[in-house]
Regions:
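Phosphate- and other anionic-substrate recognition elements at nucleic-acid/protein interfaces
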Residues: 1-9, 13-156
């Protein structure tokens, strides 16, 4: 397992959830929620620098049948734009099926009501995404997901 902090990004239509791993890549935690739109990529680039991120994982919405629709196209666009801003830090796309559903369930079990969940579910979904990516790397011995073209170096 490569050492270094990883960030994960769950892009929603209103908010962008961000999660962060520990330096050993064992545990993912919700980190920040950013309003989607003007300035969101700037903030993601700042976080990448501030956290000295090894890589950034962007959630790729995929249907149960494995198809990618409009949301996946939007996620790919965000990933490409982010990759151009933070190069040479790699950006990877990773399947985000069930992340929001799982995050809602975990928050509900933790006693959060619907209103409280709304503000943090995006970061919690990013944490679910990042934990899955970390577990995937641990199981396979390879960086998770699909490297975004033009994203710079591949982290060793």
């Amino acid at each position: 397992m490569r050492r270094g902090v990883r960030l994960a990004v769950d892009v929603g239509s209103v908010r962008v959830g961000v999660a962060r791993s520990d330096p050993d890549g064992v545990l993912a935690s919700p980190f920040e929620v950013i309003r989607h739109g003007r300035g969101d990529l700037d903030r993601l680039a700042e976080l990448t620098t501030e956290q000295d991120a090894l890589e950034v994982i962007v959630g790729l919405p995929t249907t149960l049948a494995g198809r990618q629709g409009q949301a996946a196209t939007a996620a790919r666009q965000v990933a490409a734009e982010l990759a151009a801003r933070i190069a040479p830090v790699p950006v990877r796309l990773f399947d985000e099926r069930f992340t929001t559903t799982t995050a809602h369930a975990v928050l509900r079990q933790g006693g959060k009501n619907a209103k409280a969940r709304r503000g943090i579910v995006d970061a919690a979904a990013a944490a679910v995404l990042l934990q899955a990516a970390l577990d995937n790397e641990r199981a396979t011995g390879h960086p998770p997901g699909e490297l975004v073209p033009g994203a710079g170096r591949i982290a060793p």
